[in-house]
Structure formats: structure tokens, C-alpha cells
Amino acid sequence: MSGQSLTDRITAAQHSVTGSAVSKTVCKATTHEIMGPKKKHLDYLIQCTNEMNVNIPQLADSLFERTTNSSWVVVFKSLITTHHLMVYGNERFIQYLASRNTLFNLSNFLDKSGLQGYDMSTFIRRYSRYLNEKAVSYRQVAFDFTKVKRGADGVMRTMNTEKLLKTVPIIQNQMDALLDFNVNSNELTNGVINAAFMLLFKDAIRLFAAYNEGIINLLEKYFDMKKNQCKEGLDIYKKFLTRMTRISEFLKVAEQVGIDRGDIPDLSQAPSSLLDALEQHLASLEGKKIKDSTAASRATTLSNAVSSLASTGLSLTKVDEREKQAALEEEQARLKALKEQRLKELAKKPHTSLTTAASPVSTSAGGIMTAPAIDIFSTPSSSNSTSKLPNDLLDLQQPTFHPSVHAMSAAPQVASTWGDAVDDAIPSLNPFLTKSSGDVHLPISSDVSTFTTRTPTHEMFVGFSPSPVTQPHPSAGLNVDFESVFGNKSTNVAVDSGGGLLKPTVASQNQSLPVAKLPPNKLVSDDLDSSLANLVGNLGIGNGTTKNDVSCSQPGEKKLTGGSNWQPKVAPTTAWSAATMAPPVMAYPATTPTGMIGYGIPPQMGSVPVMTQPTLIYSQPVMRPPNPFGPVPGAQIQFM
């Protein structure tokens, strides 16, 4: 990071913020450091070209944008990165470059920041011209000459005459652009131009190998060509000899800068007699006078030239194969180094990794062993079922989760419907809160066995035990069962199945609900006079009302009030949204005072308002009993 400029860091940070990893890597590969692009950045960009979800035009545009920089270092490194991707990247990259009309418009580039900028600007212009020519060549022949198959069955050796005469000049133009780089060993003074020279050196070897195979194919077909084709072929061969001389000079520069001698191919010159034979054959086709030459001599000369060029091609192929082998060995060495580094890291911290890996398992195992899971929907065990048999007289087919449901819903509703007369005499601080059922003082059975024999299902709501339900205390002197008079005595509460603790149950669809127990405002109390007065008032004695005085104030749809259709009315949650109450089936006595309506709601037209306890200011609406002929709770007695 020390060689990077502040501009490079800001640009990389901007791409990091925008989330463009490709643009950030392009910026990192083309910094102002006077050195070649780093291998890690080039490898990342190569991998990006192989990914189908990477936008190749965006990658190329990022590189083109970097070439507009005024610094020769940034521009040169941008060209090197582009060249590297064209050679080693996916073919989609060079296909996109070939589809563009123009690539690099750097023919007038000049960096005037220093003397080195002037010198490097010259090579930048030459280098950009070669890259443009490389893309144009791909556009014309639809393949890269540096990547074509070589050998006896290669692309250039099996090409027909017409196509061969059109393809070889394209290779010549690309070779001319490469050799025009024309750098000396004294000018390779920095890492940037050295990186560009290495890429050009590898391209020169591969390109000349394809060029050499094209010439071999041309010579083999030369004596069978027409006159015009022979003329074109002779011109191509003369240019080939010139470029062979230039490529030899280029390879000498590579040897001078320190490239291994084994990586430089040996170029074998064709015999000069071959050129004379080609010229004589063309002259004979044109009708000129030539010295006599036999077909055998021409065949010998041609075979010698082809063998010389074939040896050159073999040398070029060996160099290419050696380069591939070196690349494979380098990758294997890197992989081996990574494995050794990984083994060292594991050897340093063996206990820590094992401990951290085993800790969660051991902790969870210990938790499982110490805290067994409770299945709230499982059936009771055999021991619990045996101990529950004496108390399970009426609930033989009762589901195990019924007590839990009643513990949440039914018990608090019954216990808090009327409240206690003594406790409710004092107004609550918050009239909108339901009075807690815990304030009701009830005698609780001392039978502890009922709790010890409870199944785990009963304990599914730990800490939320059901509120006790008030039982009416029968009078010592009077034991009157008024419910049995009308034949609707409930049998569901005849047996105490809870051992002293009431155990509410959920009624099914085909089972009638039991008569609701009266809250602490009891019909029958310890005082005989008050009990008789309440009973007489409920029966309507002395007010002249008979059973035939039943009136229906609304001609609408009748709704049954008893049986499975009965639903308790819950107090409204707010003072302005009162619950709609259905009109009673039987009219109340005219002398019965209505009291105050709960929460100050006016009575409905054509119906009797809900009766509430007169002494309460904020009380809840009364639950309508299922028996229309039963006692009406909350009515007061007036003696006529």
C-alpha cells in the first residue's frame, strides 16, 4: 500500500462502497505503483471472466476508463491487464473486444510529467496498436492465433488454399504490430514495461508458430497453385523471411534481459535455393524463359525447406509445452505450500479446536440429561392412571387437556362475575381492570393426594394454577333444591371428582352445559329470613306475573338461550363499545328496580336492560342462566 497514491485509495474505497468488486480489483491492478499488476488481482479478474454472472462489457469498460488517466503508469498497467485477460481469460472477453469498433485510442498519448513519461508514452502507443490489431485479427478469422491447435493436423496445416492465402496476411499484420514494439534491453528499466515485454514475448512465440505452420502448408501447395495464387504465395514467403529475421532480433533482446535460454526457440532458416525454385516456377507460369530444372531437384529443395521449417515449429512447440509444464509445476508448488501451511496451523492449536468443537455437544448433552423434556400432550403413565381411578367417575372419556383449558378461561370468568359483596363495596382505583380472582376467599380442600396424582398434563401451565371456584354453603336449617322442581337438575356436579377442588370440564356439542354456579351473592345463606326473601323475590310471588306473561319484544330471529347454544356474555373492554345483549325470554316484574346499567350504557329500546347489582358502580354484565324459568340473579325483593 506504500506505493499507492491517495487517488488510488480513494477510488478503491468508492468502489468498495458501491459494492463493485470487479471495478475495485481493476483499480487495484492499475495503481500508480511502478511495478507490474499483481498476480492476485490478475487471477481474480481471470476468474471473473469465467463466471457467467459477471458483466464482461462492464469489466472491459472499467479497463478502458483507466486508460484515460494522465499517468503513464496507470495507462500502461491497464493495457497489460487487458492483454493478460485476452490471453489467459475466457474467450468471451476477447470476443467482446473484437465486437467493438475501436478499443484503445492512444495514438496521441503523451505523459509530460517527466522524462520517463516521455519515453514510456512511445511504448504505450505501440502496445495499444498491437492490442487493437490482435482484436481485429480475432474479428476476421474468429479465433486467436496464439491458441489454435498446432501440429500436422492443426488449423493452419489443414487449411485449403483460398482460405490460407487470406489468413496468412492477417497473421503477418499482427506479427508486424508486435515487432513494432521494438524495444531494446536498455529500455527495459522498470517493472511495468518488463511485464508488457514478457506478454509480448510469449505472444511472439505462439504467433510465429502458427505463422510457420501456415508457410509450411503454403509451400506444400505452391507448385499446384494457379498463377495468381503462386504470385501471392511468393510474396507471402518473402515477407516471412523478413519477419523471421526480425523475430530473431526480438528473441535476442529476450535473452539479454535474462530470459532462460531454454525458453527461447531455435529458428532454422530455410535454404536460399528454395526461394530460387519458387521464383522459377512462377516465371514458368508467366511464360518467361528460365534455366532448365528437373522436377526431382525442385522436390528435393522443397523437402529440405519444409524439414527446416518443421524443426523450427517443433522448437516453438517445445517451448510452449515447457511453459505449460512450468505453469503446472508452479500451481502444484503453491498447492503444496498451502497444504503445509494448513497442517502447521492445525498442529499449533489441536486442543483448542477440539475443545471448541466438542463444547456445544457436551453442553447440550448435559442439558438433555439433567432436564428431561415434558410432553404436554402425552397420555398419563400407568401409575398415575391407577391412582386417579377413584376420582375419575364421570370423566372416563374426558380428554387430558380439559383441566388446562378451564384453568385458563372458565375458572377466572366464574370467579369474577359478581365479586365479593364486602370487597366490592370499596371502589377500585382502576374501574377498567377486571378484579383479580385471587381476592376471593374460599375454603380449599385439604386433600393433598389430588395434587400428587396429577399427570404432567395438568402442569403444562406452571405458575398459573386455576382460580378456585366458589361453592354455595348450604344452610344448616334449610336444604331446598329449587332446580329439581323444574326437572333440569344438573348431574354433572353431583360428584366431587376433584377431591374437594372443583374441576370444570368442557361441554361437547351434544351435551348440555351445567347450570352456572352462583357467585358469592348466594340465594341460600346462613340467615333463614334473608334466604326466604331472596327465593320469594326470584319466584315472583305477589306481583301477579304468571308463566303466560311471556313476551317477545322483537319479532326477529329467535336464539335459544339454553343448552349447547348458550354463551356467556363478557364485559366490554371499553366504556363506549357495549356488548349487545339479547332480550330476555320472560319479562321481569314491573316492580323490580332496574338498577344501574353496567358502564353507564342506556337500555335498548323494546327490551329489558341487563340487571346488575345496585350497590356496584362499575360492575360486569350478568351471565344469563340457561333455564328461563330459573331464578334471576341480582333481583331484589319487595314485599307487597
Curated annotation (Swiss-Prot):
Cysteines engaged in disulfide bonds, as pairs: none
Positions of region (Interaction with PIMREG): 221-294
Covalent cross-link site, Glycyl lysine isopeptide (Lys-Gly) (interchain with G-Cter in SUMO2): K238
GO molecular function, one term: clathrin heavy chain binding
Keywords, sorted A to Z: Acetylation, Cell membrane, Coated pit, Cytoplasmic vesicle, Endocytosis, Golgi apparatus, Isopeptide bond, Membrane, Nucleus, Phosphoprotein, Ubl conjugation
Residues bearing the modification N-acetylserine: S2
PANTHER family: CLATHRIN ASSEMBLY PROTEIN (PTHR22951), PHOSPHATIDYLINOSITOL-BINDING CLATHRIN ASSEMBLY PROTEIN (PTHR22951:SF16)
Quaternary context: Binds to clathrin; involves primarily the C-terminal sequences, but the full-length protein is required for full binding capacity. Binds phosphatidylinositol 4,5- bisphosphate. Interacts with PIMREG; this interaction may change the subcellular location into the nucleus. Interacts with AP2A1 (via its alpha-appendage domain). Interacts (via N-terminus) with VAMP2; VAMP3; VAMP7 and VAMP8 (Via N-terminus). Interacts with LC3/MAP1LC3A.
Protein name from the UniProt record: Phosphatidylinositol-binding clathrin assembly protein
Gene that specifies this protein: Picalm
